A protein has these predicted regions:
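Terminal and domain-boundary accessory regions
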Residues: 1-208
């Protein structure tokens, strides 16, 4: 009997990953990141989530989003909402935790392992829910920074924690290459379209 293939899905909190890598002095090479986890099993899906503002110009982030979309990532974006709090201060709301959680729960019956690129403690409930469904959860964040960027309750709940510093040699962008754009900026040209995802073609692009 042939060994069972480990089916993996990546769930990337775009801004969280960008901030974590930058705090350690490097930028992510998303091609290398994809290749690294393809080597660990059958990579069924790689989700990338980022909130966007309606008034930001698309040109500043277009290269990154376009590249992700055409190279095996499922890009999910949501427009941020501005509001005024009780003190009269203008604030921006753009949390994508729910979108990530829903996608993970829906995909749970089809995967063996979830790799979560985030240190947000709010994901503890999601991690528990995935584990109850028989999915092994790996959290990738930073514990070596001061202060640590991963919530300790999330780190403890995960089946495995990987400090992103240990992955730097495998997923960091060559400093001589053109730097990646900051994922907080978003393209207004992004359309709600879907195409089949595979290792050489594009992924799924969604705007919420």
């Amino acid at each position: 009997m042939s060994p069972q293939i480990n089916k993996i899905a990546l769930f990337i909190d775009g801004l969280n990953l960008y901030t974590t890598a930058r705090s350690l002095g490097f930028e992510i090479d998303f091609k290398r990141l994809l290749r690294e986890f393809q080597s660990r099993g059958y990579l069924l899906r790689a989700f990338y989530y980022t909130a966007v503002t309606e008034d930001q110009e698309s040109v500043s982030i277009r290269p990154l989003i376009d590249w992700l979309d055409y190279n095996g990532y499922t890009v999910v974006t949501k427009a941020t909402k501005e509001f005024v709090d009780q003190t009269g201060r203008r604030k921006v709301k753009g949390n994508m935790d729910i979108e990530l959680a829903v996608d993970a729960i829906e995909l749970a019956p089809h995967i063996d392992q979830m790799v979560l690129f985030s240190g947000d403690g709010d994901f503890c409930c999601l991690v528990k829910a995935m584990q109850r469904r028989g999915v092994r959860v790996v959290v990738v964040s930073a514990n070596s920074t001061q202060p640590p960027l991963v919530a300790q309750e999330l780190r403890r709940q995960a089946d495995e924690f990987i400090d992103i510093k240990a992955l730097q040699s495998k997923i960091a962008r060559d400093p001589g290459e053109r730097p990646a754009r900051e994922p907080r900026v978003a393209p207004q040209f992004l359309q709600r379209t879907a195409t089949p995802q595979n290792e050489t073609g594009g992924g799924i692009r969604r705007r919420l």
